[in-house]
Each structure stands twice: as structure tokens, then as C-alpha cells.
Amino acid sequence: MKKKSSDFCFGSERKAQLSEFLENLSIDFNNFDLLNTALSHSSYSNELDQKADNNERLEFLGDSVLNLIITDHLYKTYPNKSEGELSKARSYIVSEDSLSSIAREIDLGSYILLGRGEESNDGRNKKGILADAIEAFVGAIYLDSGFSMATEFVVGLFDMYIRLMFNRGDFKDYKSLLQEYVQKKYKISPSYKLDKEIGPDHDKVFCVELYVGEKFISNGKGKSKKEAEMRAAEVALKAMEDINL
């Protein structure tokens, strides 16, 4: 009888990687085998000799957990929004574009186990792989620590994006759209630099500059660095067609 990957002890190097990932997110995790499975793409497990676990089942679970958490949060936080507005917000938040963008924010791609083929094809930056992995990670948190901990993680990660959407009155992820545009046209990624912070700690405004290569493109302000980056990306995207690098 063949063993599954969860029956094998992964090395200390991999455990150190997973510990680093959790430390960056300030999350405690009990079952590292479960976490490792959540970050194991099917292309990786298919290349192993033994029958190995991958994150597809956890993705299935995490998709439902994520939808419930987002739905509950929207319903309770925005009592004056209509059903149509809430549905539109939820659809955007759990879309592949949004999930992959948030996965990039937490550097999830660096910790995913990929097969050689996906590795050589830049699989760590593929939206589908990143979106599936963050759903699997949410599913793993739910199994490991329960619904309350999964809710705390998801709301903490997604709430800023939700507030930005409602404040702007649209549901576009300008950072993701800009990154796709710049990578496709110039084969590089835009970068963001914190220029300055204005005001007291309890009411701080962050000022961010956006660059493509060495060229300054735009700036943005916000109550958080992420909000400032989003606004800088929005300005850049709307002006990008007129910019010659």
C-alpha cells in the first residue's frame, strides 16, 4: 500500500520556509502537514513517485469557507448596502483577479511547491495557481484552527480592499490591472516606494510613488500604504497610454 505525502516527514528546510511564511503573517499553525498540502500544487504531487497529496481538496473547502466569511462580513458591516451591491462586491472579492492580487501581497507564490514544468513556466505568478492556493490556505486554517481564526485572517486581509471598493464606487483592482498591462507591454513589474508619511499616528496619511523601471509614473495617498499604492496604480493606469518609457 502506497503512502500519501502526509505520511512522510518533509525536511527541515521546508519546515523553516513554512515557519517563515507564518511568521510574516503572524499566524500560528498546529498541523504543518496540512499547511504543506495547502501549498502543494498538483503539478508537484504528480511528479512524485508516491501518491502525494495536493491542494485541490483544500481549495474546494476553502472556496466555500471564504465565500461564507466574505458574505457574513459584508452583510454585517454594510447594513445600508443593497443586495445587488453586496453581491457585486462579493463576486469581485472572490474573483481570480482579486485573490491572486491578495496572494501576491502576502508573497504566497514564493512558498508554493510546483512541478518542474510549472516552475519553468513562471507558475508562481499565474493568477489561477495563486488564487487556488489562497483558497486552499483558508481551508487549511479552518481545519487547523476553526472558523473564528479563518474569519480573523480573511477579514484582516480583505477588509481594506472592500472598503476601497465602496469608497471609490467601483470594483476594479487597479494594482492587478496595472501589473498585467506593464508586464505585457514592458516585460517588467511596476514598483512602489513610500515617499513620506504625513500627520499624527492616529490619523496618518501615506504618500507612495510608483515607478516602471527607473521612471517615475505617478503617486498616490491613502490611510494605509496599500490604499496609497492602489490610488497610484489607478492614476498610472488611466495615464499609461500617454506615457513613453
Swiss-Prot record:
GO terms for cellular component: cytoplasm. It is found in: Cytoplasm. Gene3D superfamilies: 3.30.160.20, Ribonuclease III domain. SMART domains: DSRM, RIBOc. Residues 18-146 form the RNase III domain. It comes from the Bacteria. Its cofactor is Mg(2+). The keyword Ion transport does not apply. Keywords: Cytoplasm, Endonuclease, Hydrolase, Magnesium, Metal-binding, mRNA processing, Nuclease, RNA-binding, rRNA processing, rRNA-binding, tRNA processing. It catalyses: Endonucleolytic cleavage to 5'-phosphomonoester. Mg(2+) binds at E59, D132, E135. GO terms for biological process: mRNA processing; regulation of gene expression; rRNA processing; tRNA processing. Residues 173-242 form the DRBM domain. The active site is at D63, E135. Its EC number is 3.1.26.3. GO terms for molecular function: double-stranded RNA binding; metal ion binding; ribonuclease III activity; rRNA binding. Transmembrane segments: none annotated. Homodimer. Belongs to the ribonuclease III family. Digests double-stranded RNA. Involved in the processing of primary rRNA transcript to yield the immediate precursors to the large and small rRNAs (23S and 16S). Processes some mRNAs, and tRNAs when they are encoded in the rRNA operon. Processes pre-crRNA and tracrRNA of type II CRISPR loci if present in the organism. This is Ribonuclease 3. It comes from Borrelia garinii subsp. bavariensis (strain ATCC BAA-2496 / DSM 23469 / PBi) (Borreliella bavariensis). The gene is rnc.
